[in-house]
Amino acid sequence: MAGAGERKGKKDDNGIGTAIDFVLSNARLVLGVGGAAMLGIATLAVKRMYDRAISAPTSPTRLSHSGKRSWEEPNWMGSPRLLNRDMKTGLSRSLQTLPTDSSTFDTDTFCPPRPKPVARKGQVDLKKSRLRMSLQEKLLTYYRNRAAIPAGEQARAKQAAVDICAELRSFLRAKLPDMPLRDMYLSGSLYDDLQVVTADHIQLIVPLVLEQNLWSCIPGEDTIMNVPGFFLVRRENPEYFPRGSSYWDRCVVGGYLSPKTVADTFEKVVAGSINWPAIGSLLDYVIRPAPPPEALTLEVQYERDKHLFIDFLPSVTLGDTVLVAKPHRLAQYDNLWRLSLRPAETARLRALDQADSGCRSLCLKILKAICKSTPALGHLTASQLTNVILHLAQEEADWSPDMLADRFLQALRGLISYLEAGVLPSALNPKVNLFAELTPEEIDELGYTLYCSLSEPEVLLQT
C-alpha cells in the first residue's frame, strides 16, 4: 500500500510538472519576454509550495552548504528583496538569458498571436529598428519631461549660489583674516550641467592652505583601516616645527588633521557667526543653515517654491592629491579625508562626448533622474552611475545619439552585474570600490529592484 501511495504521489507530481512545463513553454508566445519571466517565477513558487505540502511534515528543509536557503528553496518567511549568495548565483545565470538589445522589448499592448508568414531579413531588421526607436523615443520623452531642468531655473539657482559665495568670502576675509584659505569656488552637477529633475543642490569648495613641509597624506589602504579612496593627513616634523607653527594645528587629533574638527570650525562660522537673515534680506533670499545632521549646508529659498542646498565643503591639496572633508558613512572612519575623483570623472565624460558628439552624458542624466525619482534606488550616487557609464564607454565605441536605447539597457545590465559582485571599481582608480559604503542589504535591494525592471525597462520611466 505504501508503495502504491508513493507511486500515486509521483504520478500526480509528474502531471503537475507536465502542466507547468506546457504553460512555461508557451508563455513567451502569449505574454512576451517580461510576462514569461514573471509567470515563470510565480509558477515556480506555486510548485515549491505544492512540493512542501505533499512532503512528510518531519522532512527537513534542504539547506545549502553555507547553511542558507538556496534560490531553489526560498525562505518564504524572509524579505523577498534580500538575496543570499546562492540566490545571487541563480540571478547571475538568469542574467545570461535575458535580452540586452532594446529591439527585444516589445512596447506594444498585448494582442492575441496571429499566424505570420516567414519574414524576410529586411522586414525583421525593420521591425527591430521600430521597436528600438520606440524605447528610444520614450527615453527622450522622459528626459525632456522629467529629467531636464529648464534653463531659466538653472540660471537662477546658479546666481543664488554665486551671490552667497561672494558674501561668505567677504565675511571670512573680514572676520578671520589670518585663516589661510584659497579662493572658494562652486562645484557639483548643477555647475557642470549634469543635474536633473530640479536645481536643488550645489557644492561650495573651501580650499585650505597647508604647508607642504608640515603635512603629508597617507592612502587609506596603507593604514590598519585599509580603506581605499580615503586618506589620512599627517602632521610632519613636529620636533622642528612645534605645535602652533601651522594655523591648522588647532584641528589636529592624534597627530592627524581631522576633517571633522575642520568642519566643526567652519560650522561655528557658517551657522553661528553670520547673520543670514540680514544677508538674505539684502539679496532677496531666505537663507538659513540646514538642520542637523547637515551641519555644513545652507538652505536657500530663492523663489517661492524653489530651494537650493549649498554644501560647504573644506578641501586640501597635497601634491597631485585633492581631498575633501566628506565623511565616510561609518563613524570609526571620521578621521579620514575622502579622495576627490568627481572633477576628473566629469572631465573625462565631457571629453568623450565632445570627441564624437556622443550620448554618454544624456544616458547618465536619465539614469540619475530614475534613481532620484525611485525611492528604492535612492542609495545609488551620481559618482557610481558616472563610473558605470565610463566603464561601458571603454567597452563600446559607438555612442551616437541613435544608440541611446541600447546603451541604456547595457548600463542597466552592467549595474546589476556590479551589484551582484558587490564591487564597482572606480574607472580612474580601480583600487577604490564605490560600493564599499553600501550595506549588503542595500546592495541586495538595489539589485532586486533593477533586476525586476530589466525585462520591462519602461517601468522605470513611469516613476
UniProtKB/Swiss-Prot annotation:
Top-rank taxon:
Eukaryota
This protein's record includes keyword Transcription regulation: no
**Per UniProt, which keywords does this protein have?**
Membrane, Mitochondrion, Mitochondrion outer membrane, Nucleotide-binding, Phosphoprotein, Transmembrane, Transmembrane helix
Region: Important for interaction with DNM1L, residue numbers: 160-169, 234-242
Membrane topology of the entry: Single-pass membrane protein
Q: Which residues form a coiled coil?
A: none
Q: Membrane-crossing residues?
A: 24-46
Region entry Disordered, spans: 57-77, 96-123
Side Cytoplasmic, residues:
47-463
> What family is this?
Belongs to the SMCR7 family.
| Disease affiliated with this protein | Optic atrophy 14: A disease characterized by visual impairment in association with optic atrophy. Atrophy of the optic disk indicates a deficiency in the number of nerve fibers which arise in the retina and converge to form the optic disk, optic nerve, optic chiasm and optic tracts. OPA14 is an autosomal dominant form characterized by adult-onset progressive reduction in visual acuity, and pale and excavated optic disk. Optical coherence tomography discloses a severe loss of the retinal nerve fiber layer.
Name of this protein: Mitochondrial dynamics protein MIEF1
